[in-house]
């Protein structure tokens, strides 16, 4: 079986996760399809537990950021801060990002195009040493290999 990730659909939702997951479960019952959800914590513990209860299904993996948002987790993962600081200074001409908090705050305020550019550049030499935050890596591993 080929476990490469090459047929992925990405959808972004602000609210309504549970309804969408319930519909997805009905539509995909008995298929080999998988649903991986990466969500921001946003200081909402109840929402986190409501969504992560879907991890009981063998074809769903929900993972939540440790910190408030995705940007916070990316910047604070292992040695990512220095790599990202260099990247954003060179590629986006950002200044005043000399601490992890300043960098993640600026990134959160940036337009969606900045996140798109970053995602497209993840395979570039400039970002080859970036470590995915654990919650993202967990979902990627699930999508490739299933539950562990």
Feature roles, as predicted:
Residues 1-148:
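Acidic, divalent-metal-binding catalytic cores of TOPRIM
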């Amino acid at each position: 079986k080929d476990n490469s990730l090459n047929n992925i659909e990405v959808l972004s939702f602000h609210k309504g996760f549970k309804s969408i997951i319930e519909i997805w479960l009905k539509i995909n019952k008995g298929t080999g399809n998988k649903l991986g959800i990466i969500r921001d914590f946003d200081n909402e513990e109840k929402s986190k537990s409501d969504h992560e209860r879907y991890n009981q299904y063998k074809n769903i993996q929900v993972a939540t950021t440790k910190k408030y948002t995705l940007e916070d987790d990316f910047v604070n993962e292992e040695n990512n801060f220095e790599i990202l600081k260099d990247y954003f200074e060179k590629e986006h001409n950002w200044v005043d990002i000399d601490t992890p908090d300043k960098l993640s705050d600026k990134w959160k305020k940036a337009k969606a195009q900045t996140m798109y550019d970053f995602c497209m550049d993840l395979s570039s030499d400039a970002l080859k040493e970036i470590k995915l935050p654990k919650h993202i890596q967990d979902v990627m591993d699930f999508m490739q290999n299933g539950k562990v």
